[in-house]
Amino acid sequence: MRLNTLSPAAGSNPSKKRVGRGIGSGLGKTGGRGHKGQKSRSGGKVRVGFEGGQMPLKQRLPKFGFTSRKSLVTAEVRLSELAKVEGNVIDLNSLKAANVITKNIVFAKVVLSGEIATAVTVKGLRVTKGAKAAIEAAGGKIEE
């Protein structure tokens, strides 16, 4: 194989469509755009979701719910992620230092997902019932 013998695989480099270049090309006259109408004109596009003046589906459906502002500063921490923290006292700052949660997080909750093998002390974090049982079974404890 040499640089001067390289060529693209068969069919991988099709020639571009040359539109409006005569009837024999197959894309002459209207150039594959059909007859008249907005989509046949240059710049004739409709925005996403536009239904020709009819009230769009997005606006016909009711609004519901909201985004809790508290959820933006709250994180769920899995039991398996507690192993990433060095030391056996786990609090908000140690989770941030270990890059388990981001710096803008104010509240964290430990949930039962994965396993924990080492005995750790969890300070100042919310803990689910299942996670609490798993931490205590591993010889750890929870402090408020």
Swiss-Prot record:
Biased composition (Basic residues): 32-44
Keywords carried by this UniProt record: Ribonucleoprotein, Ribosomal protein, RNA-binding, rRNA-binding
Biased amino acid composition, Gly residues: 21-31
Keyword Ribonucleoprotein: yes
Disordered: annotated span: 1-52
Compositionally biased intervals (Polar residues): 1-14
PROSITE patterns (alphabetical): RIBOSOMAL_L15
Ribonucleoprotein among keywords: yes
GO CC term, one of those recorded: cytosolic large ribosomal subunit
GO molecular function, one term: rRNA binding
One GO process term, biological-process aspect: translation
Domain of life: Bacteria
Summary of subunit composition and partner proteins: Part of the 50S ribosomal subunit.
HAMAP family reported in the protein's UniProt record: Ribosomal_uL15
Function: Binds to the 23S rRNA.
Family the entry assigns: Belongs to the universal ribosomal protein uL15 family.
Name of this protein: Large ribosomal subunit protein uL15
Origin organism lineage: Bacteria, Pseudomonadati, Pseudomonadota, Gammaproteobacteria, Vibrionales
